[in-house]
A protein has these predicted regions:
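Glycine-rich nucleotide phosphate-binding loop and flanking beta-alpha elements
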Residues: 25, 64, 94
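Single conserved hydrophobic/aromatic residue that forms the stacking wall/gate
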Residues: 87-96
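N-terminal charged helix/coil linker that caps or initiates catalytic domains
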Residues: 2-9
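Right-handed parallel beta-helix/beta-solenoid
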Residues: 46-47, 67-69
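A structural motif detector for beta-strand N-caps
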Residues: 11, 15-19, 23, 29, ...
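Residues that scaffold the ATP/ADP-binding catalytic core of kinase and kinase-like folds
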Residues: 61, 67, 96
Length: 96
């Protein structure tokens, strides 16, 4: 489910991304090229923006949430493994 919160909404660079049908994208979330959000994930950009970098994937059951004043940026080609809870910025190519 994609939920806009006023002017906070999902943005993308193009159509080269994938969101599982039961994932929750809330507020200010940006998906870069070839990014993917898998089953039962929740990305809550209600406080600050979340940016998922090129080729990165957020795997099943993971949650990304922001705190006021702290956006979350996931770099290029990052894998956030299943059932992870993330509040932080991740550089390019790590596995969480």
């Amino acid at each position: 489910m994609i939920t806009d919160l006023g002017d906070k909404k999902l943005t993308t660079e193009n159509d080269d991304y994938w969101i599982a049908p039961d994932a929750n994208i809330i507020g200010s979330v940006h998906l870069s090229r070839d990014a993917s959000v898998w089953f039962n994930c929740t990305l809550r950009g209600d406080n600050e923006p979340i940016v998922i970098g090129e080729g990165s994937n957020v795997q099943d059951g993971s949650i990304i949430h922001t705190d006021p004043g702290f956006k979350c940026t996931v770099g290029k080609f990052v894998t956030i493994g299943p059932v992870s809870y993330t509040h932080l910025t991740l550089p390019t190519t790590p596995y969480v």
